[in-house]
Every structure is written in C-alpha cells, then in structure tokens.
Regions:
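Helix-start/capping segments and mature chain N-termini
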Residues: 1-134
Length: 134
C-alpha cells in the first residue's frame, strides 16, 4: 500500500469485491508488516482510553484532506491524537473506531470481528469537525 494517490487502485477494487461478496460494509487494509493502513476508501482512527490513534503515513495510508484537517483540529482541542502503528489486535481492544473521507465525512464503525463499538466520543468529534469546517 502506498500513501501516494494513484490510478492504480487494484487493492481497493479487489477489497471492495471481497467486501460485497461477503456482505461486509468495508474492509481493513493491512500493509506488508500486517499493520493497519486504512479502510478500503477512507482513513481509520481508533479511540482507546480517551486517546485517539491513526496509522502513520509510513503505514501506507493515504494522507487524505479530511485526515489532515481532523488531525490539526484535534491537536488544537482537548483531545489527544497520535499517529502510530495500529495492529488488528488494537482494533479489537479499541473503545471506538471511525473512518474519514471527503465523500462521507466522518463515519462511526459499529463492529469489527466480534467487537461491537460505542460511538459517544466519535459523535462529539463529528460535532467538533463540523464546527471547525463550517
């Protein structure tokens, strides 16, 4: 996975087909180190113990416009945000997970594998984002 936006979206296309064939709304894309890079069509953020984490650009995630804006907004707020490596185990241990892209904005993830997430903090972050972008 590359952080450079290109016309080569074969991984995303194959992942989208896999998701559709298996009744999934989305898939988590992993890099060659088997660390989380992003969702099929969006950046990924996790919340654990009131701290927000998102994969580093080195993970292969796209440095999306909304991702950059949200990180800047969160850094200026009372939230703690860190760019770090995220494993699939981290996803199962998170309190909340959300994604961002310019089409959907910020959306809450309801579940991953057998883990069901709340979305209380994610909803507050949506309000913060909307207030800062309007």
């Amino acid at each position: 996975i590359s952080s450079i936006k290109t016309n080569n979206k074969i991984i995303n296309v194959v992942a989208s087909i896999y998701a559709k064939e298996n009744g999934l709304n989305n898939c988590v894309l992993l890099n060659k180190e088997k660390m989380v890079a992003e969702f099929i069509n969006s950046n990924i953020f996790i919340i654990k113990n009131d701290q927000i984490f998102t994969p580093t650009i080195k993970s292969g995630c796209l440095n999306g416009v909304l991702r950059k804006n949200l990180i800047n907004i969160l850094k200026k707020s009372s939230y703690s945000i860190s760019e770090t490596d995220i494993s699939t185990f981290d996803l199962t241990q998170s309190d909340e997970v959300f994604g961002t892209n310019v089409i959907q904005g910020l959306f809450c993830v309801t579940n991953y594998r057998n883990k069901i997430y709340s979305n209380n903090q994610s909803q507050q972050i949506i309000k913060l984002l909307n207030n800062n972008l309007s």
